[in-house]
Each structure stands twice: as C-alpha cells, then as structure tokens.
Amino acid sequence: MYETIQTPFNYGGLTLKNRIIFAPTTFGLSDEDYFEKIRRIAAGGCAMIIVGDVPVGKSHFGKSLFDKKGFAFYEKVIGIAHDNDCKVCAQLHQSDSNIKAMLKYVPGVLTKRISMQELRPLLNNEVAPYITNMPHKKVKEITSAFGTAAVLAKKAGFDMIQIHGDRMCGSFSSSIYNHRTDEYGGTVENRARFAVEAVSAVREKLPDMPIDYKLAVRQENPHYGNAGVIEDELRVFVPMLEKAGVTSFHVTLANHSDLENTIPPKNHPYFSEPGCFLKFCDEVRQYTNLPICGVGGLTDPDFMEKQLADGRIQCAAMSRQLLADPDWVNKLKDGHADQIHRCVRCNKKCLGGLMQHQGTHCIY
C-alpha cells in the first residue's frame, strides 16, 4: 500500500527518497530544542525538510548565513538531517516589514498592550508604503542578495534552494501592496520582476542548483490573502518564473492576512477540507509541466496517495501532521498506518503555542 508515497522522485533536479516534505515552519524554540525537533522529523522518514525563513542578509531577529554563528547553526541542522538520510532545502526570504515602522510597536508588545494577534494587521498596514516607496537601488541590492545567500547556502550544505514567494517577493507581486509606477509596478509582468530577478540571481550564481519557488496565490470571491498573485495572473507569472530558472513549485495560499487562513483549522469557514489548497495546484498546472508540491490540510495517507498517484501533485508537504507524528512516513512504510497520530487541525499548540511565545508544539 501507499506505493506512490514511498516511490523515489526527482523533484526539480533533486532526487528524493519518497514524496513527503516537511513544510517550512517557524518554531520559536531554543537552538537545542530546534535541533531535536529536526532530528525527530528527519528520523521519521520524510524525504526533505524545508528550513523556513533563511534571510538573504544579516538579520537582527534570527539566524543568518552571513555571520559565523548563524552559518554554524545551519551547518548543524543540515548535518542532523543528512545523518538521517533526509535532504534539506533553504527557504531564502526577505522580510517586507519596515524595521522603522516595527520599532514603534515594540513598547506596546513588551508591555502586552499589543498582542501578537493585534500586531500582525498593524505591520501589514505598513507593507504597501514600504514596497511602493523603496528606492530603486535598494530593490536591486535585495534581488542580488538572493544570489549571494544561495551561494552561502550551498556552501553550508543545503541540497536545494526555495525562494519564498510570499514576504517581499509576494508583496511586490501583489497589486494590493505594490503601487509603484516604475518597472517594478503596474502590469503583472512588472510586478513579477522582483521575484524573477531574485530567481535569476540564484540561477546565475548556481547554474545547477535546484530552485523551488513557494508560489503564493491570492484568492478572490471570497477574498483570502493579500500578497502574491491572483489566480488569473498565474498564466503570466508562472512561465516567467520557469524561464528565470525555477525547477519546481510549492503552491499555497498567499499570506498577510489572518494566520488561520494560511494555517487553517478544521472549522475554517472555507478551507476545512483535506488538501484545502490543492485547487491552486490545479491552476498552476495549466501553465507548467514542472513538479508541483501541494500543501495544506494534508493528514490522511489514503487521500494523499490518490492525489499523488493521479498526478495532481508530485510531492506533498506537511508541517502540523509531522509535528503531531514525526514517524508518519515510517509507520506507512512498516505497515502501521492505523497507528498514526492524526493531526486534528486544532491549532492549539502549534500556531497557538507560537503566538503565545511558547514555541511550536502539538497536543500529542
């Protein structure tokens, strides 16, 4: 059983031992707890871990490949995964948060007058002016930095690069946030330029490196997500990314709204069904033959086997389910699917724990 899930696959130039990927996840843990979490997930049998939010420059808020301590941190993460026969992908990103704007909210957060739930919309309101008014020279510096960061990622031992198509790439892509009047704004082609240049910078530096693109799709009617591109714009956006050097797509809903839209609980009014974002994969498939990884509400091995066997997606990414049971893949392999701890999509200790500064965990 579950033959397709367990079949090796060439995902955008990288051979994976099976079709299961650990989706990029913010943990909010100490280094040692983070290393242990990575070890458990890798040992559980997934083919690749995507390490989320690897900055393309020096960072004030987290680990960076651009300093010795951060570089060593990523080397250790990679070593732990590789020791467990698990590939590792670096999700390169550039935040679209205006640091100066963020600082004015720090006192309120520290005194708890502003909750994390209240902070998010405040920061989102700062995105449009930040993106729209960013100096042309700064834009070029950032897109070029993706290439520099990719070289460091390869040196550290990462097997694949993923360009984070939400964050700044997504905000430049979005007509909601991008009101520029130069070559980076206006038409779909112009709004895609930032992302295309980021991909091109990586491809120029690393001609043979597999490049995954986290493609953030904005839905209308009803409206969900603010960054990224709307479905009708995929016909322009997807071929441009492929031409620039993307070798696979990781397709999901655009962010910059309520986190429970992009990490939907079981009682979500619109995204409650298994594989809740796979319809966006169907849209992307119309414009590319590259491998597509689906994500969102994937917990049931029977459902996932069918999607993979039918060719709807080529890989399946999970975060909450592998937090609930890191041994998901091994249990399938050993014929013990009935023993899997199923994620119930309650968001209590994963998203809930993160928002309460207690780290990302699970009720199990």
Where are the regions a protein language model picked out?
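Flavin-dependent oxidoreductase catalytic cores
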Residues: M1-Y364
